[in-house]
Amino acid sequence: MPNTNVFTGMDGSITIAVDDAESPEGQAATAVSDGFGLAPIGRATDVSVSVTSAMRPFHEIGQRYATELRPGNVNVEGTMGRAHINGALLRLMLGDAAAGTRPAGAFVSPTFNLSLLLENPAKPGQRSTLTVHGVKIDGWSYQMPEDDFVLESVSFKGLWIGVEDASGDAG
C-alpha cells in the first residue's frame, strides 16, 4: 500500500550499502564505510536527489505542436551537505587517493548505494525508502565560515533509483 504520510527531515536517516563487495569499487566503499562508521551517515543536511529524462518532441511538417514525445536517457544525481567531522565523504569520492599521499597512478573510485529512509516515530512501520544505486561522488567542497558550522558538501551521480513504501500496521 502506498505511503500517505508527510515527513520532515527529522524523520530521516541516510545509509550506504555496497552491492558488489568483491569488486575493487565495492571494496573501496566498504573500507570507507567500515573505517568511518557510516551506518547511518550522521550530521547530514540539505539532501537532494533529482531524476531527469531527456524528452524529445517529434514535429511533423505542417504542424506547430509536437505529434509525439519520445523518452530518452534518464539521469540520476543529487547533493548532500554534512557537518564536517572527518574525511569520510572525501574518501568516498577518492578512495585511497585521499589517504594523505599522492597516488602513483590511476585509482579506484568507490561505488555504493545511498538509501534515504523516512519514518515517522509516531507511526512505526510506515516508511518510505528511496535508494540510489551505483552512486559515485563527483564533487566535494568544504566551507569554513567565520561564525557558523564548518560544512562539507558533495554532489553525486547514480545509475538508477528505486522507491519502496511500507505501510506498517493499519490500526
Specify the residue positions occupied by each region the protein language model found.
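Polar/acidic, low-complexity leader/linker segments enriched in S/T/G and N/D
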Residues: 1-51, 161-171
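Oligomerization/assembly interface segments of phage tail-like spikes and tubes
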Residues: 65-90, 146-162
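Beta-strand elements of well-folded, non-transmembrane domains
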Residues: 18, 51-55, 82-86, 116-122, ...
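A generic structural signal for short beta-strands and their flanking turns/coil linkers
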Residues: 43-45, 74-78, 102, 108-114, ...
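Short secondary-structure capping micro-motifs at structural edges
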Residues: 59-70, 93-104, 141
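Short, acidic/charged, Gly/Pro-enriched secondary-structure junctions
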Residues: 95-130
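Mixed-charge, glycine-accented linear interaction segment located at domain edges/termini
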Residues: 2-6, 124-171
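Structured soluble/peripheral alpha/beta segments that form catalytic or ligand/cofactor-binding pockets
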Residues: 46, 52-64
